[in-house]
Amino acid sequence: MKEHDSLYSWFRLVIALLVATVGNIGMWVVVIILPDIQQEFTIDRSTASIPFALTMVGFAIGNGVMGRVVDHYGITKTIILAAIINTVGYIAAMQVNNVYLLSILQFFIGFGTAASFGPLIADTSHWFLKRRGIAVALIASGNYFSGAIWPPLFNSALQSDGWRDVYGILALATIFIMIPLSFLLTKKISEETSRASDAASENRRSSVNISPRTLTILLSIAGVGCCVAMSMPQVHIVAFCIDLGYGPAVGAEMLSLMLIGGIISRLINGLLADKLGGVYTLLIGSTLQCIALFLYLPFDGLVSLYIVSAVFGLSQGGIVPSYAIIIREYLPSAEAGTRVGFVMMCTIMGMAIGGWMSGWIYDITGSYAAAFWNGIIWNFLNISIVLFLINRNR
């Protein structure tokens, strides 16, 4: 019986997407409650941001560690382990009375949340061959769906009961939605189907004559480069708009445009990857992102910035999933979780480094122009690695 791209594969994709939508909220919850914890603990905005910073550190490390776990124990046990970690973290967060304890708990919540990103992407990729690109893109979009769906649902709870009850709701959702759904993902792909997929991967990799280790390192460096570049507009667009005199509300709208464009781009690039392959799709996305960064330099009018932000969102959304697609196209399926998780960890580190670096450059120069140029240079590093891989394939 055919397993790749089967009806069961698509059913499994829907279940995995539901798991991702619930599981990834651990990354967004601290963003939702940030103003409330700042007020309750009487702290400044930078201190109130510490929980989010540690969430991202946990999320990055978790992608690497949970990737190895999924290779050894399967996705069901990995999701259950992550659900337990997050549930304990949510319940404990309801009891804290200072931001530092909350920050420590958010590190572990970020760690558990990671299982619903890289490892879930890797597991889903096993069940697709011809439609692997769009399947990976859909699962990777679970992170965006989570950020779009959950925050509006929490508004009434925040206003009536406070931020602690939000954690309580998440604990219940994790127990009663994530864990039951994970049991629907127990079935594993057959060894025969995996061998067929691995044979195709080996043929591709032999054509570029690169070891799995070297390819993973190159993709990791490329991931850091593209995400340092990507972080400049995403992390600093609100501050950039304030500097230009447009105010934070306009910056928030531009960020929303980027995220909406990112979802659309992610899906389009998934379809593109099924036609062209992951490497060429990555080249297209990286090149378009670089062009969008250049466009921020000459344009500072309100309408033009809205347009450029939309263009940026449409260019960058498909870049990160392309790394997972390349890994599955060129490397053994048995190592998919480990290698996808590691590269995803590097992309997240790139976002963190880039966000800090852009702020540091702004502090030195008093302008975001140099920060945009910094992002463009890092983007060129990413593009050069992709071109190297394409050249090796000729």
Residue ranges of model-derived segments:
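Structural signature of the two symmetry-related core transmembrane helices
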Residues: K77-I91, Y280-L295
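Extracytoplasmic
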Residues: F11-R45, N63-M66, W150-P151, M232-V238
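Conserved MFS/SLC helix-loop-helix module at the cytosolic interface between two early adjacent transmembrane helices
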Residues: I61-Y100
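Intracellular juxtamembrane helix-capping segments at the cytosolic ends
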Residues: A115-F128, G318-L331
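Helix-to-loop junctions at the C-terminal end of transmembrane segments
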Residues: G62-G74, R266-G277, D363
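Paired small-residue
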Residues: G89, Y100-F108, A292, V303-V311
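Helix-loop-helix hairpin linking two adjacent transmembrane segments in secondary transporters
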Residues: I139-S190
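Extracytoplasmic gate region of multi-pass secondary transporters
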Residues: V30-I37, T214-N269
